[in-house]
């Protein structure tokens, strides 16, 4: 009975998170209340509070859940025989990220999360400081770590210059991905998403390589 109760609790928690994501993306974080979230699920506001002590706690849980989901999607794109990002090269990681971008734009929850993060939260507000810091420093998100490790691998193998900062390159690469995916979701990108990502990563790769002639990142 206890196990059944735990499953029901987790199921309800996930329903609340899904409802919150939909409403946050459509109405905005500030304009959405616990009453709105509860009404959409035919629940009481108190029931929502039982799972999340505040709207901020709910948002943090939602961000964590979505980052974990994106991380699982990236892990599923690992080359056959690989179980981690540790031994991957930059071109391989770049290819994984391009394919993941194609997955994201076809995923309703993924697109809703992007709209929420980019358009429906006032990050400058003081109340958002803790969440903003957690999101910006959350290196659990697989792509950042994958790009960093790939650059470090390149430096060790001699294919990447020794003066290159792996963390800096990782930040640039994730920012490219984030910006182009959001532009595609917002219908403002006037070129092919996958082709543009590949060419962008190819440019980054060429800028950090030690040799003059190297295979493109594809």
PLM features: what roles do these ranges have?
Residues 55, 62, 66, 70, ...:
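Hydrophobic/aromatic residues within well-ordered alpha-helical segments
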């Amino acid at each position: 009975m206890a196990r059944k109760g735990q499953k029901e609790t987790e199921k309800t928690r996930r329903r609340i998170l899904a409802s919150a994501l939909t409403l946050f993306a459509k109405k905005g974080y500030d304009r959405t209340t616990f009453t709105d979230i509860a009404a959409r699920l035919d629940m009481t506001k108190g029931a929502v509070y039982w799972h999340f002590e505040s709207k901020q706690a709910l948002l943090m849980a939602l961000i964590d859940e979505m980052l974990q989901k994106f991380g699982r999607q990236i892990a599923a794109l690992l080359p056959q025989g690989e179980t981690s990002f540790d031994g991957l090269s930059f071109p391989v990681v770049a290819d994984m990220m391009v394919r993941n971008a194609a997955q994201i734009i076809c995923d309703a929850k993924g697109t809703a999360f992007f709209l929420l993060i980019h358009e429906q939260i006032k990050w400058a507000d003081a109340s958002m400081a803790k969440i903003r810091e957690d999101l910006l420093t959350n290196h659990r998100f697989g792509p950042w770590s994958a790009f960093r490790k790939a650059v470090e691998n390149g430096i060790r193998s001699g294919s990447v210059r020794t003066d290159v900062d792996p963390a800096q390159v990782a930040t640039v690469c994730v920012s490219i991905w984030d910006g182009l995916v959001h532009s595609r979701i917002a219908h403002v990108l006037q070129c092919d998403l996958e082709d543009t990502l590949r060419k962008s990563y190819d440019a980054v790769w060429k800028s950090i390589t030690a040799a003059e002639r190297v295979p493109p990142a594809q």
